[in-house]
């Protein structure tokens, strides 16, 4: 076995990036990720400075037959960025971003967070679809699809991806686009972590300045009526209006339902569109004209890094009476006031793209249903996990078999297949071409054997 000291010597020779191993004062911080449930000890943490150093790292782990994991933002609930006894390739130091206002495009490095990316593009009044928590990394979000507030107008994050530079398992640095390595480009738009390490993303940007955004809140006693009205409301929503529901508890333990909105259009039109939701007599109404950048960071305080997380997720076509009744039964028993049940509405451009156009296959208008349980005290883990599993079990009659891959924990091959649906066989064939030995296996893994 290659000793850590040998790894550090060989990799650090001529490397501008960092190599951190056990015993280093920086080691525990380097191996920590968003989900405090993840406590794994990699053999070494390597922070490359650029694509050439990523190539060196890939060649090194292949030469020494070492397991590998890759970290972008470290924000996934599964914690695949950290693997026991592996070389952890940490891209967080790669933060270059170049915006071209003439072509409305941006070239961005994989270590950027959503907040860093948005700050650069919003300086010129531009944006592309990204997630809804600014500490999330752009890499994992995009490679898994990328739902966000602009999905109705511009599709998912991966739908605005124009090209990507990717280091494959054999150490080649390839460009993937609709003109080069087209099959690889298809695969990385939804299943990207399986095929290599993306060192640069090129996105199409769109004009986004001020948005009409905020939340309406309603008490539990009115929630069934509110949710039925909301379900009807969103089915007639224009592309420019994106919405989500969040069910949770107030700090005093009172169940509450939030409807969160983002309208990318004229304020007067948006106010008219939102009138039906306001007639439902919300307890609070924070909807206002605000910078898109402010909306993108509005959720950050609710998701501090280091809390313990356990999630369950699936696609939900309709808010049926049975689904609503189940939610009403479970919400008052939610063990942690930090937890929530979310329903992010996917519609518009994101739902009109063909399921076979990208590896992300779930293109029907529907809700991304997510039970997002989070808590701080390790002694509370059992009851939070049990509550999450119980609610997910009772919601099964109303959920599709499919799931958004970015919401998956370590849930087995069946759930990975469900995440890719009809596209899974093509992804297996692509995996055999670009990673037949499954070097990139610390992910929602597509097994090249097809099993």
Where are these regions (language model features)?
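Soluble FAD-dependent oxygen oxidases
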Residues: 1-451
